[in-house]
């Protein structure tokens, strides 16, 4: 299974974050900047291995996205073992149809289908739904799985995008889109040298839970306790409360 998403746009603006500074000299960021364009990051993520394929672009039209995605998916398919040929056409179709169970609007499958080789999770955007692109996926044994409305967090490519953005841009002030693209692509190359597989509810979730427990150790908020604190009421307040006509 692979997941795909487009991150951005990233502006040529100062990005807050920590950085190496001499002792006693805090980092400074300008309050004004000039916008000279934006950059986006095309991302194809393999959760099982943690490896990511990226490409920085200044525009993300279908003419840019589809050729890159087809090229990267073809490379991913080439690395897979050969498909099993012992299954009948009916069994191949049943394997495809199994991934559409429960969908409100299932995709119309072509009459002829190759063996199912790869699952692709991507957002429900117009550029991902063009007939030519979807038919190309079917012809190469790729089943598209679209995230529901408001469920883009299910796309695990967004998790690796947050990591790449934080490592590449925080504490920097890029002045051109080329600088943003170079930083993001270099960060992705560094990540692929020692990738981390994605695990739902893994160590990151445990760290967040421990941090939440530290912040809210006494109750639902760090500013409250389990036991209410008694407070003496002034006589004037008691007099006003005793004479109010309603609750």
Question: Where do the protein language model's features map onto the residues?
Answer:
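Extended, low-complexity cationic-aromatic segments
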Residues: 1-79, 83, 207, 211
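Acidic, metal-coordinating catalytic cores used for nucleic-acid/nucleotide bond scission
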Residues: 60-61, 89-96, 120-131, 149-154, ...
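RNase H-like polynucleotidyl transferase catalytic core
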Residues: 27-34, 139-156, 172-174
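Short, basic/hydrophobic alpha-helical segments
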Residues: 64-116
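C-terminal domain-tail junction helix/linker
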Residues: 14, 182-247
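Short beta-strand segments
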Residues: 2-4, 118-123, 145-148, 199-202
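Active-site proximal helix-loop segment of RNase H-like, two-metal nucleases, encompassing DDE(D)
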Residues: 52, 143, 157-179, 190-192
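Mobile genetic element proteins and their domesticated derivatives, centered on retroelements
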Residues: 3-5, 44, 50, 69, ...
